[in-house]
Amino acid sequence: MEMAKEQELILVLDFGSQYNQLITRRIREMGVYSELHDHEISIEEIKRMNPKGIILSGGPNSVYEEGSFTIDPEIYNLGIPVLGICYGMQLTTKLLGGKVERANEREYGKATINAKSDELFFGLPSEQTVWMSHSDKVIEIPEGFEVIADSPSTNYAAIEDKKRRIYGVQFHPEVRHTEYGNDLLRNFVRRVCNCTGEWTMENFIEIEIEKIRQQVGNRKVLCAMSGGVDSSVVAVLLHKAIGEQLTCIFVDHGLLRKGEGDMVMEQFGEGFDMNIIRVNAQERFMSKLKGVSDPERKRKIIGNEFVYVFDDEAAKLTDVDFLAQGTLYTDVIESGTKTAQTIKSHHNVGGLPEDMEFELIEPINTLFKDEVRALGIELGIPEHLVWRQPFPGPGLGIRVLGEITEDKLEIVRESDAILREVIREEGLERDIWQYFTVLPGIQSVGVMGDYRTYDHTVGIRAVTSIDGMTSDFARIDWEVLQKISSRIVNEVDHVNRVVYDITSKPPSTIEWE
């Protein structure tokens, strides 16, 4: 990943903590660019990146375990401020000549520390609540260090070598449970590392446009557009950079939400004057899905067919050298570090053919999802599009459980439109992470008017979450749920029952298939 030289950087080294991405995000929220890299990064690479500061993350291991993660000690001699968090502090202590030993039992949870008012704790109260999570403990600090915080359980809750600007904390400042964690990180970033905090979406756009123009020159770029937030932001950013050199292919597989295909063409084709080729492939997809009920087979068919359709359309274009993708920074992190956890694959449509000879452009691969939304707003994309609901690549194909038919798709499409309309009317769009309807394939007895019915059940799924990795069902007001239910059974044909999914993730996933 190339960075503009004028951009301030805080480098976070990964030792396997579940909070690693939080550190990076907290720094970015301060207006300072931050990247997460593997702990095995070379000294030469660090020098090339020229960070203003380095943070060593926490991790689940002991510094004394065989094969435990370590770093080149030369990092401490670069003249760059270093902050070690939990495992990062223990490793710093060990590498610089102090002593660390295994604790009798793992310390996990809230604790109270007493801090001195130095650079790290500048302007903060001496007594603070912090979040501890460690199995080793420091029993002797290295030469040149002094204690700047203690707690009832340890004399070394935080340490510093003021001369070399090396710090360590035995708690997690990046988590919300640590009372003044953000303030501590801000002191490190601003006071110790002297960062100015000028990283904004506005200057990100300027830097990225210049990079795109340098990479592309006068050649052409192809972008697969789904109408989702990521591909839409990529397309608008590229169009702003290279104009008519960009061509977008929008594959309409017939599994979209109500009015979605027309919306893409109207908002982006006409609204942004972009060159978008719409491929109406509904019949092709439905014929391939006929009789298929297994969810994995459905996913593979939809993914593969998307690739074939895109490949066919791309072959009709000439002189295209680049393919643009909406890869996010979370994707880069999950695939780019040895300590990353394996996470269930997302529903996004599968990769494009390996034999397509394009050079990749991934202009948002340094951004998190919320930053992509902020970028979209800065680019002038209407707010209601930027804040659209996440939508899986296979679309409604995995919200109709079992075999997909046109009639079943229509039920999901109409009921989902009602759900989204009511949520919007009630002002709940920003409060709920994701919400949609599903067709479980269950029919039940009902009474409508004077007649007995035997019709479909519609399920409502609405969850709250921060990142989608875990979630809880949304506590929607009963009157709102009643309004949604009443409208669905009265306005959608062949539905006589509505149920609400009150399961968390885990054990369930957000999507039903």
From Swiss-Prot:
Name of the featured protein: GMP synthase [glutamine-hydrolyzing]
Positions bound to ATP: 226-232
Any GO MF annotation of the entry: GMP synthase activity
Catalytic residues identified in the record: 86, 172, 174
Known role: Catalyzes the synthesis of GMP from XMP.
InterPro entries: Class_I_gatase-like, GATASE, GMP_synth_C, GMP_synth_GATase, GMP_synthase, GMPS_ATP_PPase_dom, Rossmann-like_a/b/a_fold
Pathway(s) of this molecule: Purine metabolism; GMP biosynthesis; GMP from XMP (L-Gln route): step 1/1
Catalytic activity line of the entry: XMP + L-glutamine + ATP + H2O = GMP + L-glutamate + AMP + diphosphate + 2 H(+)
GO CC annotation: cytosol
Pfam families, alphabetized: GATase, GMP_synt_C, tRNA_Me_trans
HAMAP family the UniProt entry points to: GMP_synthase
Sequence ranges assigned to domain Glutamine amidotransferase type-1 in this UniProt record: 9-198
Coiled-coil region: none
Enzyme Commission numbers on file: 6.3.5.2
Species the sequence originates in: Staphylococcus epidermidis (strain ATCC 12228 / FDA PCI 1200)
Assembly: Homodimer.
Assigned keywords, A-Z: ATP-binding, Glutamine amidotransferase, GMP biosynthesis, Ligase, Nucleotide-binding, Purine biosynthesis
Ranges where the GMPS ATP-PPase domain occurs: 199-388
Residue ranges crossing the lipid bilayer per the database entry: none
